[in-house]
Amino acid sequence: VYLLILVVLAIPLGNYIGKVMNGERVFLSKILVPCESFIYKVLHVDKNEDMGWKKYSFSIIAFSLISLVILFFIHLCQGFLPLNPENIKGTSLDLAFNNAISFVTNTNWQAYSGESSLSYFTQMIGLTVQNFVSPAVGMCVLFALIRGFFRVNAKGIGNFWTDITRSILYVLMPLSVVLSLVLVSQGVVQN
């Protein structure tokens, strides 16, 4: 049944993602365009800027390094951060670095017991955020590569900040809502 659902949804979902990443209107545009515009305004992003491969690559690396540093320090400082009713101390330097690298690169390798080693804050703000932004970065890389092949004579391969915003807002968040409703309807544990 699972494979059948994947096969049936592959083409419509692929078409939807293609339209989103090309900036075309989709059924969620009416709701999400104001959110998207607000994000661009707050971050001072020119959504129409077409980045060359060097600027696009630099944006990916800068974004990933900033994510890495933030997640690393969340792990180290979790003993002082909120949402830590068990008073779990910060992780060791090597474990914090390993976890940060792992989640930023979307490998999500866990060398610890999450329930007893990480606070709620670290899990929610650190890891869950990375569970959205690291696949979004992967989607950005994929679409930049595709554009690079198809835009032979163009100077740019898209805008990283636009791509990551759209991949999170239009693809990953809606998919997570739909799939979480499916899981809730099946009685999956909420805690």
Where are these regions (language model features)?
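P-loop potassium selectivity filter motif centered on the GYG triad
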Residues: P82-L127, V189-N191
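N-terminal alpha-helical transmembrane segments of multi-pass membrane transport
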Residues: V1-N98, L142-F143, F150-G158, T162-N191
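Pore domain of cation channels
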Residues: I5, E115-R147
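Functionally constrained cores in energy, signaling, and assembly domains
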Residues: P12, A100, V104-A111, N131, ...
